[in-house]
């Protein structure tokens, strides 16, 4: 029999596996499955806040103090836009920060319809934050959760650290995923040291 679980539970278990101890959140309709999963996950403290900006700033402060990835969870629409300031702060200060936002169901996304908004409280948050994050994506397939989470953690913590953003539609949060069949993210091989090549070039020039 295939072992499945909710996408939201997979995300919570992934965070625990990466050593995350606390998630700062404001529950909402757009992230209800994720909020439930964070509250139920063993080893993970769900820290409710009064405002999404406070979530992002608290997660950024957590990152500074612990030298680990800080995690904030917000809902869709204004919940997501309220967290932008925290992402901007983490970008400027080079802090590894993961912001997870809820999103309307995939069927309610405006896509290329020409509409500015289709689903209730829908905002294209990914386009808004691309300029201040190292990685920002709306997860369109639950089986890609592992790939996006691994890539986000890798980019947040390597090179110059910084914020990353995952936008997760409601039907992926609450829908079944099969972890054993998920693809992972393989970081690109590090570039070969340039010192020897540079020395050889200088030698040829001289």
Predicted regions and their residues:
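N-terminal alpha/beta PP-like core and its mobile active-site loop of ThDP/TPP-dependent enzymes
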Residues: 1-206
């Amino acid at each position: 029999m295939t072992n499945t679980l909710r996408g939201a539970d997979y995300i919570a278990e992934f965070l625990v596996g990466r050593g995350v101890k606390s998630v700062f959140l404001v529950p909402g309709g757009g992230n209800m499955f994720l909020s439930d999963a964070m509250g139920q996950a063993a080893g993970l403290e769900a820290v409710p806040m009064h405002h999404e900006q406070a979530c992002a700033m608290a997660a950024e402060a957590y990152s500074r103090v612990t030298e680990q990835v800080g995690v904030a969870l917000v809902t869709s629409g204004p919940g997501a836009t309220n967290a932008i300031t925290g992402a901007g702060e983490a970008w400027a200060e080079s802090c590894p920060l993961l912001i997870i936002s809820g999103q309307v169901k995939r069927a309610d996304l405006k896509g290329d319809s020409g509409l500015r908004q289709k689903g209730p409280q829908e905002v294209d948050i990914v386009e808004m934050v691309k300029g201040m994050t190292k990685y920002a994506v709306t997860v369109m397939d639950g089986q890609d959760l592992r790939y996006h989470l691994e890539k986000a953690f890798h980019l947040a913590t390597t090179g110059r650290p910084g914020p990353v953003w995952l936008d997760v539609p409601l039907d992926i949060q609450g829908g079944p995923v099969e972890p054993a069949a998920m693809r992972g993210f393989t970081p690109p091989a590090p570039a070969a040291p340039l010192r020897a090549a540079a020395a050889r070039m200088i030698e040829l020039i001289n």
